[in-house]
């Protein structure tokens, strides 16, 4: 995915995960997962937005969106125990980490 290399990739990813179009949501979560895997940590606002959108996606009906969101959450947790605890708290009762 070439989008991971442009400086505005996070902006696009956050716009896409907030979309109501499944293909955009999947692409947005996949892009965020790739950015997280590359070590690009989100800021506080990004963390809140990501976890809010992931919670909505994980409770939705589209299996592709759920899968992409779950992968992104797991990549987010790879940043360390603090990030894992944040995700665990935000997704309690929705997604088991």
Where are these regions (language model features)?
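Alpha-helical scaffold domains
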Residues: 1-97
């Amino acid at each position: 995915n070439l989008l991971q290399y442009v400086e505005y990739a996070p902006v696009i990813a956050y716009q896409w995960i907030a979309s109501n179009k499944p293909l955009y949501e999947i692409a947005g979560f996949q892009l965020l997962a790739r950015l997280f895997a590359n070590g690009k940590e989100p800021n506080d606002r990004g963390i809140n937005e990501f976890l809010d959108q992931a919670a909505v996606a994980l409770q939705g009906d589209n299996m592709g969106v759920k899968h992409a969101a779950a992968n992104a959450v797991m990549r987010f947790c790879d940043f360390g125990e603090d990030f894992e605890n944040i995700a665990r708290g935000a997704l309690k009762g929705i997604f088991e980490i």
